[in-house]
């Protein structure tokens, strides 16, 4: 394969005039309406985005004739351009991305000119501000991001706490900048693998000592070598323009039969329901009516679940291309910064060792250290969490360099040392075995120290906890304490064992006071959003539960292949990764892996508008969390024949064009979607002119009304590429960080309604993702071969049912709220099938009511010797058989294209029944009570520990046994019904066996689906709870009375009537 440099001078044939020869897109038009011509020498067809990329980051010359590109009208200037008059017109604004940053500088100026000695409070604005004294927040050039030399590396900022005392907070807020290349990519018509292989071969060929001879003495060989070097550089530049990801459709041989069977099943279902409705059972009308209503609901539920899986897709990422574009070796990394959130509440339910492993895997992630910041939210204000995080930061100084030196996976020490694999595979350093043994010993000592802290925390002293310096712990009262921030690690705040910097690690506990609504996890996440925006302001945010560690150290790079893609990234609100779990037995009795949902449902949604947000393992675009809409894609339309004949000018005023775009977007925006967006802010300030201070003041006041009373935070929301202002000091930033986590900060703002995690449901993840999709954003589903994250699944039936109960309760809350997808957001840009998926997500708990009734029908039919269908005819047999065959065919073809095993699919079907008749049923009634009567149900956190001897063990057991009663009752009812039916058939003769088989099949269908529940009930700690025994005895007594009433052993043969025959009959 020839390189680009070798073929550059050859004439290229078969060139389509209107097609870009780099990216195969349309060349497009100039602002004057003429065809865009990048090179005026050879007119080689190149589109404007590729032209701009070549000028900015390429070789700045035409690919065919090698003539240097001239600066065209509307193009930004680059170093080396000659002075050309008439080019700096209004078109330049189109490519002037840092315009937003100028506004943010002005916004911050109002805050910083108030004086350094003032306390945090209501913002005060000066009447006049000089332009010459406005502090610079950022600039067009790359800045170092370092604070002034007078700033200390670590300093103490105090916050007033109860009793008038002051609490020290360690701080290290130096932040490196980050730039994002937003130009489109091209050259997508050459295979990546072949080109890289060719480049490597040339690298090996040209490797050798560099000669110092003069150019005149080297001859033609050296000229060829220099040409090869230029060709290699051109090859790398070409690869950097390639797309960072690719969407791969399911092969038609697998997806088309699946779609055909779905349509066939829909037709059969309609014919089946028509038969059921038109053929009632006269002697069992009530049973028939109940069964038909249940079947109609099941059909509706199946439609809502099935059709969002119509367009499943796979995705591939190219990490090498990402590195070539943003992270080249020997150059400063241009990868975007990522703020990682870890949330925890109760360290006794969520063991500190589990949280520590999650934090260690984050600190050791394969990403530039100055681009990673880890924020740990302790919403329980536990001193145990604080001290264990301090121990974790010390152990990280040894663990992180060990991971990066030997490239180990996973980078959570507990799971790395517990993995039963050949840890010597692919390891070539002779020191690895010795270092691994030493590190394992270090980790065991670290575990002992954490266990000692846990043991100490079990006995709280009467006077409360006291810190090492003798001061009381501010969080002794978990419902009344100040905000706390502690920076453990960071730039210039401590190095690892080899002298390298470590990612920033920050402990955060938001302020809580009586009388303020805290909104549980959603409120804690929003507090982290504000703190991180003030201290580091990474443009992307990764959200992890405390028990979900990073299993793939390149997970962040996988997400950046979508979020930093110039074409796709601007439209993406988040990248969702599937949840994978450790510690599950191979049988997976309770469908803990949830493979059907993660490998089938979410892949189907990825082909529509993207997967739903599942609460963890998700990388967010910070702009989307702020409630902004995505940029509108401008579709270039060809001019009509009439406009050409009229000869009208196609050059439009830029302001009129903006108004037109706003009107166009307004037609697709829901009335509840925020009216603020970056374009409106820019236009308002730009229209009045930078000299109009009144307009600037009004813009800031409107933003502070939306985001809260913090000028520093408001300014950070306008910085598209993130970062902190170089002029700010660590003292001011930490003081502002304490302010934004105060309990009253969100009052009279849009937090929780339009910004951040949305309030109103215990499952805040569904609402948050739904609001983003309703605004027009799309999400991406990323499934790398090595799972990105792994977590701890519930290990027993009790934890699993309580977890499902919480999810279902959140769905019921959304169903009865104003954000219900059945009626919310129809003026927005939510796609139809995506709405189907969200509707199914909210109404699925309601299915528990018809499911419970339908599972009870077999036993009732067996007891009463009636059935839900009339005598089966040949036509009815065909409909029943066709329906069952279509159900099995759909499942088989679904497993075929998704790769899900039949055992996983069957376990999912079983747990759908188990959860439906237990947790979902309770969630419906508790949700109705909460919405209508205001009776709130408090849920404890799902335990991640192996034992259950906590303070809430009795309450936990009571809740578990309450969920146990409905499925236990169903099992007993159907088992007794089977015995009663068989006994009746034995005493009724041969003719009663035929109808009995249909009833028995119906009953066994219920029993088989509940079998894992029965097995779990009998196997829980080798004992059955007392209340379950009492209920079982009670139910057995009830059905014993029914048995006597039925009296199956009494002869059913009747003789002649004595009244008719007389005595001599």
From Swiss-Prot:
Residues 282-283, 864-874, 932-961, 1015-1023 are extracellular. Its cofactor is Zn(2+); Mn(2+). The modification Phosphoserine is found at residues 3, 151, 211, 216. Palmitoylated, in part by PAT24/TIP1. Mn(2+) binds at residues 521, 545. Its EC number is 2.4.1.12. It is found in: Cell membrane; Golgi apparatus membrane. Changing residue 617 to E: In cev1; reduced amount of crystalline cellulose in roots. The chain crosses the membrane at residues 261-281, 284-304, 843-863, 875-895, 911-931, 962-982, 994-1014, 1024-1044. Residues 643-672 are annotated as: Disordered. Glycans are attached at residue 938. Residues 656-670 have a biased composition (Basic and acidic residues). Expressed in young plants, flowers and roots, and to a lower extent in leaves and stems. Localized in all cells except meristematic cells. Accumulates particularly in root caps, root hairs, epidermal layer, midveins of leaves and anthers. Not present in old tissues. Disruption phenotype: Mutants cev1 are dark green and contains more jasmonates and ethylene, that leads to shorter and thickened hypocotyls and roots, with prolific root hairs, and the accumulation of purple anthocyanins. They exhibit constitutive and high expression in leaves lamina of vegetative storage proteins (VSP1 and VSP2), basic chitinase CHI-B and plant defensin PDF1.2. In addition, this mutation confers resistance to powdery mildew pathogens such as E.cichoracearum, E.orontii and O.lycopersicum, to the bacterial pathogen P.syringae pv maculicola, and also to the green peach aphid M.persicae. Keywords: Cell membrane, Cell wall biogenesis/degradation, Cellulose biosynthesis, Coiled coil, Glycoprotein, Glycosyltransferase, Golgi apparatus, Lipoprotein, Manganese, Membrane, Metal-binding, Palmitate, Phosphoprotein, Transferase, Transmembrane, Transmembrane helix, Zinc, Zinc-finger. Belongs to the glycosyltransferase 2 family. Plant cellulose synthase subfamily. Catalytic subunit of cellulose synthase terminal complexes ('rosettes'), required for beta-1,4-glucan microfibril crystallization, a major mechanism of the cell wall formation. Involved in the primary cell wall formation, especially in roots. Homodimer. Interacts with CESA1 and CESA6. Interacts with STL1 and STL2, but not with GOT1. Binds to CSI1 and CSI3. Interacts with PAT24/TIP1. This is Cellulose synthase A catalytic subunit 3 [UDP-forming].
């Amino acid at each position: 394969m020839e390189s680009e440099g070798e073929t550059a001078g050859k004439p290229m044939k078969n060139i389509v005039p209107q097609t870009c020869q780099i990216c195969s897109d349309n060349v497009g038009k100039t602002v004057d309406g003429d065809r865009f011509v990048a090179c005026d020498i050879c007119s080689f067809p190149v589109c404007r985005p590729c032209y701009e990329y070549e000028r900015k980051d390429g070789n700045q010359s035409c690919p065919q004739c090698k003539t240097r590109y001239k600066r065209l009208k509307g193009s930004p200037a680059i170093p080396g351009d000659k002075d050309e008059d008439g080019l700096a017109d209004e078109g330049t604004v189109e490519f002037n991305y840092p315009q937003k940053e100028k506004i943010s500088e002005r916004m911050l100026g109002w805050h910083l000119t108030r004086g350094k000695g003032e306390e945090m409070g209501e913002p005060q604005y000066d009447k006049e501000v000089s332009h010459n004294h406005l502090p610079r927040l950022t600039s067009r050039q790359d800045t170092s991001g370092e604070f002034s030399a007078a700033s200390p590396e670590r300093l103490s900022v105090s916050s007033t706490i109860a009793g008038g005392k002051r609490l020290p907070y360690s701080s290290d807020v130096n932040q490196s900048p980050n730039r994002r290349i937003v130009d489109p990519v091209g050259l997508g018509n050459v295979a990546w693998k072949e080109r890289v292989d060719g480049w490597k071969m040339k690298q090996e060929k040209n490797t050798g000592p560099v000669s110092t001879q003069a150019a005149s003495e080297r001859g033609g060989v050296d000229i060829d070598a220099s040409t090869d070097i230029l060709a290699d550089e051109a090859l790398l530049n070409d690869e950097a323009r390639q797309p960072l990801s690719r969407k791969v459709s399911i092969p038609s041989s697998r997806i088309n039969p699946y779609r055909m069977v779905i349509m066939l099943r829909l037709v059969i279902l309609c014919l089946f329901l028509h038969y059921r409705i038109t053929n009632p059972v006269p002697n069992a009308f009530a049973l028939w009516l109940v069964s038909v209503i249940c079947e109609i609901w099941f059909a509706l539920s199946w439609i809502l679940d099935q059709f969002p899986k119509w367009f499943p897709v796979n995705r591939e990422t190219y990490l090498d291309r990402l590195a070539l574009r943003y992270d080249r070796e020997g150059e400063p990394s241009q990868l975007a910064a990522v703020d990682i959130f870890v949330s925890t509440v109760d360290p006794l339910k969520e063991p500190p060792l589990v949280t520590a492993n999650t934090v260690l895997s984050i600190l050791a992630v394969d990403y530039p250290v100055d681009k990673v910041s880890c924020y740990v939210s302790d919403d329980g204000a536990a001193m145990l969490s604080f001290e264990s995080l301090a121990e974790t930061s010390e152990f990280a100084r040894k663990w992180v360099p060990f991971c990066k030196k030997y490239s180990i996976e996973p980078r959570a020490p507990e799971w790395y040392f517990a993995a039963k694999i050949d840890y010597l595979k692919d390891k070539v350093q002779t020191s690895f075995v010795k270092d691994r043994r030493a590190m394992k010993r270090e980790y065991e000592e670290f575990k002992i120290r954490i266990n000692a802290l846990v043991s100490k925390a079990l006995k709280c002293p009467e006077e409360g906890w006291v810190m090492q310096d003798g001061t009381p712990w501010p969080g002794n009262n978990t419902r009344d304490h100040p905000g706390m921030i502690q920076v453990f690690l960071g730039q210039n705040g401590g190095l690892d064992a080899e002298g390298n910097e470590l990612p920033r690690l920050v402990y955060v506990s938001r302020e809580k006071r009586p009388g303020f609504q805290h909104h549980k996890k959603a409120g804690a996440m929003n507090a982290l959003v504000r703190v991180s925006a003030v201290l580091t302001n990474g443009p992307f945010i990764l959200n992890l539960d405390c028990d979900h560690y990073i299993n793939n150290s390149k997970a962040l790079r996988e997400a950046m292949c979508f979020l930093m893609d110039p074409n796709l990234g601007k439209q993406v609100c988040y990248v969702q990764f599937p949840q994978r779990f450790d510690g599950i037995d191979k049988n997976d009795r309770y469908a803990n892996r949830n493979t059907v949902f993660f490998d089938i449902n979410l892949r189907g949604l990825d082909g529509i508008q993207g997967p739903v947000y599942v609460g963890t393992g998700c990388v967010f675009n910070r702009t989307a969390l702020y409630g902004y809409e995505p940029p509108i894609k401008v579709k270039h339309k060809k001019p009509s024949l009439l406009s050409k004949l009229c000869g009208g000018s196609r050059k439009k005023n830029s302001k009129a064009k903006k108004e037109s775009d706003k009107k166009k977007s307004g037609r697709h925006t829901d009335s509840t979607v925020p009216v603020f967006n970056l374009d409106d802010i820019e236009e308002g300030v730009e229209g009045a002119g930078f000299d109009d201070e009144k307009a600037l003041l009004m813009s800031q006041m409107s933003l502070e009304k939306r985001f809260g009373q913090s000028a520093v935070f408001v300014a950070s929301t306008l910085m598209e590429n993130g970062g902190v202002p170089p002029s700010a000091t660590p003292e001011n930033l930490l003081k502002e960080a304490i302010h934004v986590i105060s309990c009253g900060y969100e009052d009279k703002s849009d937090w929780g309604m339009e910004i951040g995690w949305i309030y109103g449901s215990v499952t805040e993840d569904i609402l948050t993702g739904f609001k983003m999709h309703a605004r027009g954003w799309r999400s991406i589903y990323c499934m790398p071969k090595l799972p990105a994250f792994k977590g701890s699944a519930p290990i027993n039936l009790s934890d699993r049912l309580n977890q499902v109960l919480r999810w279902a309760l959140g769905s019921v809350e959304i169903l009865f709220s104003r954000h219900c997808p059945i009626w919310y957001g129809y003026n927005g840009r939510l796609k139809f099938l995506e709405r189907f998926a969200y509707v199914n997500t909210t109404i699925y708990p309601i299915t528990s009511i018809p499911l419970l009734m339908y599972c009870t029908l077999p036993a009732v039919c067996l007891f009463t010797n009636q059935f839900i269908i009339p005598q089966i005819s040949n036509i009815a047999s065909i409909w029943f058989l066709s329906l069952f065959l279509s159900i099995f065919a759909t499942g088989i073809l679904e497993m075929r294209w998704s790769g899900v095993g039949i055992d996983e699919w069957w376990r999912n079907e079983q747990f759908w029944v188990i959860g439906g008749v237990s947790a979902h049923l309770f969630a419906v009634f508790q949700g109705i009570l909460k919405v209508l009567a205001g009776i709130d149900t408090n849920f404890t956190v799902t335990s991640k520990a192996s034992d259950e001897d906590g303070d809430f063990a009795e309450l936990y057991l009571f809740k578990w046994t309450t969920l146990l009663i409905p499925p236990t009752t169903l099992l007993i009812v159907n088992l007794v019904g089977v015995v009663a039916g068989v006994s009746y058939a034995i005493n009724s003769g041969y003719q009663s066996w035929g109808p009995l088989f249909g009833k028995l099949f119906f009953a066994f269908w219920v029993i088989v689906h509940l079998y894992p529940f029965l097995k779990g009930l009998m196997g829980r700690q080798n004992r059955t709870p007392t209340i379950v025994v009492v209920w079982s005895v009670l139910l057995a007594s009830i059905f014993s009375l029914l048995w006597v009433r039925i009296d199956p052993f009494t002869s059913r043969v009747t003789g002649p009537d004595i009244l008719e025959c007389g005595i001599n009959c």
